[in-house]
């Protein structure tokens, strides 16, 4: 379109060839899972501090996530495997980039749907080790929640200089809540939103 604000660039030019193909198995499909077609997520951030925003995509299938390193001039390189960030959970949803451990390097936090519908896994935290390498350390940081996560955000809610984490979870629509609405006052272990405070003693750890 003439004088358009945006221009669509083909994958042949950018080398971004990510595709999200939702997994369907064991009756896990749109008929049983209301959010089946919500899609994955995307986050941009400068993982190597070269001044260029890199891109991370999440997929609704195991090992389908992709990390693209920005080489400049709208050209990207798929470094997923060498970076170690393909993902190990069955169903990934949103993704957030933030400097979780305050070391000056951008980390990656992946939200996942797990512990229901036959889906395995947990939210994944990839800590940036430098040189475009990451290590999955969600257990170490206490952010390995296994629930119905849609998206997460990091922010300093208590103004103590470190990032805390809020996780938005989707509902699994339990029948008990429909019959007795008073049940909605209680936090559901799978679908209740989660808020983690960043606590530092000898190590950095998040507390729900």
Identify what each model region corresponds to:
Residues 1-208:
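Beta-propeller-forming repeat regions
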